[in-house]
Amino acid sequence: MFTTDNQLPAVRRRHGPAARILATITAAAAGTLAFTGSGQAAECQDPEALTFAMVPTEETVAELELYKPVTDRMAELTGKKIQFFMPTSYASVVEGMLGGFVQVAVLGPYSYVIASEKDPAVEVFATYAKKPGHMQEEGPGYRAALITKKGSGLTSIESLKGTTLGLVDPGSTSGNLMPRVVFGGVIGMDLDDYFGKVVYTGSHELSSVAVGKGKVDAAFVATHRFDNVVNKGEIKLEDVNVLWQSDPIPQDPFVYRNDLCDELRAKIEETFLGLGDQPEAKAFLENVKSNTFVPMSPSDYDIIRTLKAAKDARKKSG
């Protein structure tokens, strides 16, 4: 379960040609039905191959190679061929899960809640417990942080009125949902009314670098993603002011479709929860700044559901 003991104080389904292509792929990859001992159809999916997808990050290309020991282990434990799907947006991964083309994925907390509300078959089973870093704290949580460039004179929330704000992606938790709902409550108005201009940069890395180069005045970034940018030498912690941080957010959920057969889902869980004991997975765990994966359940993300509901209600009333 997600705890905060060690922590410091809408995507729409697409239609048209792309959707039809995805539907065709889904139909071709559909698994066979498994049967119970009594001979009755259990209506669980047991496909010949599993498609594993991840939300794109600033380190996606490097992660493709680092994930190989993980996908190799999944192939060994499940006896399935593993196909890696690297999309270009949060929405693409969600669409793949909803269409059944993707069976296993890494999502952001907000995109997971969006997907699971559209289809309860999308279910979280694990996440990683992070090591402490420059801004990141130890444990299975992280925070949204509002940063400005040191020396810019932007040292208070009040000083940000009328400036340019960088967000990440409409499907991002720390780079859109938390700022709009929680920080919006702090300032008492919509971000678009408080700031002179609000832009989406596309990634936490780009938001962090944009602040450092003065292309945006302020940005909301995830603490663990900011650490990645520091580790790459593109920015230093002392280069920024941290004006605000959110309460802890559960880390990126690893999800599967729960209409997969029980034994198959158990093997997928074993793939990730046992990585800490696999020497060949050391580089992967180092890359995500973790020693181990921990089990997670849908209720661990109820805080995100509450925030989404508040955002949706505000949108309707507006």
Residue ranges of model-derived segments:
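Bacterial N-terminal signal peptides
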Residues: A23-A34
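N-terminal secretory signal peptides that target proteins for export/translocation
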Residues: M1-P17
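Sec/Tat signal peptide C-region and signal peptidase I cleavage site
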Residues: F35-A41
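An extracytoplasmic/periplasmic, membrane-proximal ligand-sensing/linker region
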Residues: C44-A53, E58-P69, A75, I249, ...
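Bilobed "Venus flytrap"/periplasmic-binding protein-like clamshell domains
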Residues: P47, F52-E76, P87, Y110, ...
